[in-house]
Amino acid sequence: MMLHIPGVLTKEQVAQCRDILDAADWTDGNATSGAQSALAKRNRQLPEGSPAARAAGDAIQDALARNALFFSAALPLKVFPPLFNRYAGGDAFGTHVDNAIRLLRGTDFRVRSDLSATLFLEEPEHYDGGELCVEDTYGVHRAKLPAGDMVLYPASSLHHVTPVTRGARVASFFWIQSMVRDDADRTLLYQLDTQIQRLTAEKGGRDASVIALTGIYHNLLRRWADA
């Protein structure tokens, strides 16, 4: 499932993050690449664990913790600290798949990358190109979202970023280990939760159907969760 999550950051929060990022020193994006990705990747990136990356990343993690749609769709167990990249002057990222396990340098913290996330930090009209293209059995899905919006998709997907030919595309990217490993199971739970929320709004939380469906949701989560 590929999902657009609007308004993860407010415009004010985006501006605060950009103030941090625009004052930072950027390095070659291949610092975090695997062997396959290094052959396809050309961009700039904030050094992992740098003060700027930590400050902006903390703001994003705080926002994610308050976002009900993110929790419903991802069922997060672990979130890799957000990283940041910048594409300009023809930079692009060819077709690749993300590494299955992400290690936080200098620690024993590791994340199984069930889901990948890109949080856009530049308005789409300010640059040409830079579309995130995610492939699945139904074709290629493209994302170029307003600043503050995020796209969530299975980390097992082939994906690429088209060349940026004008302006600069600035974004955060990170990975999530879900409590529910299987994408189909996780999608089913998300769809069920969405309908429970809709039914609750119509009938109230004490309705017998709402109570029954909520029980089914939690029993499925109990069956499938790794937590």
Curated annotation (Swiss-Prot):
2-oxoglutarate binds at R169. PROSITE patterns: FE2OG_OXY. It is an enzyme of class 1 (oxidoreductase). Keywords: Dioxygenase, Iron, Metal-binding, Oxidoreductase, Vitamin C. Residues 78-178 form the Fe2OG dioxygenase domain. Its EC number is 1.14.11.-. Fe cation binds at H96, D98, H159. Binds 1 Fe(2+) ion per subunit. Its cofactor is Fe(2+); L-ascorbate. InterPro entries: Oxoglu/Fe-dep_dioxygenase_dom, PKHD_C, PKHD_hydroxylase, Pro_4_hyd_alph, Pro_4_hyd_alph_FE2OG_OXY. The keyword Oxidoreductase applies. One of its GO terms (biological process) is intracellular iron ion homeostasis. SMART domains: P4Hc (SM00702). NCBIfam families: PRK05467.1-2, PRK05467.1-3, PRK05467.1-4. This is PKHD-type hydroxylase BURPS668_A1690. It comes from Burkholderia pseudomallei (strain 668).
